[in-house]
């Protein structure tokens, strides 16, 4: 038998255990500062937000990991979102934070990308413990996955912590609508 510990909601929220509002738990400290990143793709090439493919585009930046069950649920949706909106100016960037074994042997990451048909930019950003150092502009970045929505001007316009799995029914369907709606709103804006 496995032991479980219950925590009252107010105590959990106070200690950061569970987000009380998934759209506000993780936020960008200074909205005037652009989202910056630097990480390696699966070929070992360094990619940053200044890469020409991102210029003037709306970005969905996903903090993910191949070890994270909800990241497995979110990846196919992000691939679908990318295919639907890339022609309108959307780029999706995964910043994957992996354990030492995955960093040493990229086959698991390659299998993750292949399994979900990921054709958006997939970068290896470091270990989970380095997330605060690699993404210093974020506050309360302590749950996987976390997704940032970045306007054409490079500034964070929204974030979402966690991902409601397909088994959650209406929660999942609503989250898909929310993500799509925010992407459409950002795409409609001219930078």
Locate the predicted segments by residue.
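Short pre-active-site segment immediately N-terminal to redox-active cysteine/selenocysteine motifs
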Residues: 57-59, 64-67, 74, 99, ...
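Hydrophobic beta-strand anchors of alpha/beta hydrolase catalytic cores
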Residues: 60-61, 92, 147
């Amino acid at each position: 038998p496995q032991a479980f510990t219950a925590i009252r909601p107010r105590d959990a929220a106070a200690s950061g255990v569970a987000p009380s509002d998934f759209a506000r738990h993780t936020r960008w400290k200074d909205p005037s500062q652009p989202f910056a990143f630097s990480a390696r793709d699966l070929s070992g090439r360094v990619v940053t937000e200044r890469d020409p493919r991102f210029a003037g585009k709306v970005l969905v930046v996903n903090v993910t990991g191949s070890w994270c069950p909800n990241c497995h649920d979110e990846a196919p949706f992000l691939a679908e979102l990318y295919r639907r909106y890339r022609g309108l100016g959307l780029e999706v960037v995964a910043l994957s934070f992996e354990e030492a074994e995955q960093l040493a042997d990229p086959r698991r990451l390659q299998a993750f990308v292949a399994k979900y048909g990921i054709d958006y930019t997939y970068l290896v950003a470091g270990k989970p413990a380095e997330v605060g150092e690699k993404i210093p502009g974020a506050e309360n970045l302590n749950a996987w996955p976390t997704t940032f929505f970045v306007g054409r001007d490079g500034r964070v316009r929204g974030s979402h912590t966690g991902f409601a799995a397909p088994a959650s029914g209406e929660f999942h369907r609503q989250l898909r609508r929310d993500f799509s709606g925010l992407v459409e709103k950002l795409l409609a804006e001219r930078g």
